Amino acid sequence: MIEQQKILLDLFKLMEKKDGFIPKEYKPRQDELYRYCWKVKNVHETDFEIVQINECLYFTADTKSFAKNDELKILQLLNYLNGWSYYGIFTYSSLHKTIMYEQTHFCRQFCYSKEEIYDFIFGMTKRMGLYYQSADLIFNNNIPIVEAVNNAKLNLKKRTDN
């Protein structure tokens, strides 16, 4: 077991106490050193995953929420979200009708701490929340993309301020 994986497992124990769940280990796919996944089912269902390939940690999230709507609007929304996000990138699979998010962190000379990894996970879930709220405003309320994202950002900020 490599050092970064040990740190992840320590974090997962803390997440179980704090957040009530623990990511499950899955068989690594080709070139993966390890793979952990979890599913969140609230209003929207999201599959999250952390894998390490060589000296990179990959954090991913996949959802089908809103993916069957107008493809052009989805692509415009994802393009807009990608334009201001300094972590990660959203992509869309028209074949599978899935929205995907991925962020990559290099770990060549060091291991990330539990706190840093938790922050990466928190950031990923926050960006997925921004996608969900923005898409809801666009597809269910006919609000233009820029206005929808701005409103969603404000709403998320209010939540974290409380």
Language-model segments: residues:
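Hydrophobic residues embedded in beta-strands of well-ordered beta-sheets
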Residues: E32-Y34, L57, K97-I99
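Short amphipathic alpha-helical segments
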Residues: E3-I7, F66-I74, E116, F120-G123
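Short beta-strand micro-motifs enriched in acidic
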Residues: Y26, V51-I53, Y92-S93
